[in-house]
C-alpha cells in the first residue's frame, strides 16, 4: 500500500465538511461515501486539469494544475495535491480533458459533490 493510499484512508474519517440533508443518518451516509471511495480507489497516478469557474482560491481560471488521482468513477476524479495537503475533484470524460471547478476539501466532501 502506498503512502498516498494510507493518507486517503486516514482522511476518510473526516466528514466535517460534508453536507448532510435532514432525515439522513449522518454516520450511515458518511460510511457509504467512504466505502464508495474505497470501491473506486485506484493506484495513484498524476492527472492534470484546467481551473474553471467558479475557480479555486490561489489559482487563476485557465491555469493548469496537477495532482495524484486516488479514485475515479463516471467522469469524477478524486485528486490529492501534496503542496496544499488538500483533495480536489477534477471532472471530465477522459484524463486528457479535465476541469477543476472549485470542489476541494476532505475526500468525503469531494466525493459527495
Segment roles from a protein language model:
Residues 93-113:
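Compact, glycine/acidic-enriched structural inserts
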Residues 41-99:
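Amphipathic protein-protein interaction modules
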